[in-house]
Swiss-Prot record:
This is NADH dehydrogenase [ubiquinone] 1 beta subcomplex subunit 3. GO terms for biological process: aerobic respiration; mitochondrial electron transport, NADH to ubiquinone; mitochondrial respiratory chain complex I assembly; proton motive force-driven mitochondrial ATP synthesis. InterPro entries: NDUFB3. It is a single-pass membrane protein. It is found in: Mitochondrion inner membrane. It is linked to Mitochondrial complex I deficiency, nuclear type 25: A form of mitochondrial complex I deficiency, the most common biochemical signature of mitochondrial disorders, a group of highly heterogeneous conditions characterized by defective oxidative phosphorylation, which collectively affects 1 in 5-10000 live births. Clinical disorders have variable severity, ranging from lethal neonatal disease to adult-onset neurodegenerative disorders. Belongs to the complex I NDUFB3 subunit family. Methylation at His residues by METTL9 enhances complex I-mediated mitochondrial respiration. The modification N-acetylalanine is found at A2. Pfam families: NDUF_B12. Keywords: Acetylation, Disease variant, Electron transport, Membrane, Methylation, Mitochondrion, Mitochondrion inner membrane, Primary mitochondrial disease, Respiratory chain, Transmembrane, Transmembrane helix, Transport. Its main location: mitochondrion. One of its GO terms (molecular function) is NADH dehydrogenase (ubiquinone) activity. It comes from Homo sapiens.
Length: 98
């Protein structure tokens, strides 16, 4: 059965990033490689961990980053909810419930 009209179902070659873009120079991995070299050893897979020290991954996450991540939007939603509650309560204030 032939696939027609652009129904390829995602069966195409995956694009992989070039391994040479990841460098260990200037990262803690460089120190590890030097310590291993002093013992006559080498980590051939060290470059595979270099991405952890580049770009957005380079910044370590602090407790306050985790705790306050959605705080401003959560607080805004809280203020809107409280405002709506007071507004609806003021509409029903004239009606007395027995």
């Amino acid at each position: 059965m032939a696939h027609e009209h652009g129904h390829e179902h995602g069966h195409h070659k995956m694009e992989l990033p070039d391994y040479r873009q990841w460098k260990i120079e200037g990262t803690p991995l460089e120190t590890i490689q030097k310590k291993l070299a002093a013992k006559g050893l080498r980590d051939p897979w060290g470059r595979n961990e270099a991405w952890r020290y580049m770009g957005g991954f380079a910044k370590s996450v602090s407790f306050s980053d985790v705790f306050f991540k959605g705080f401003k939007w959560g607080f805004a939603a809280f203020v809107v909810a409280v405002g709506a509650e007071y507004y609806l309560e003021s509409l029903n204030k004239d009606k007395k419930h027995h």
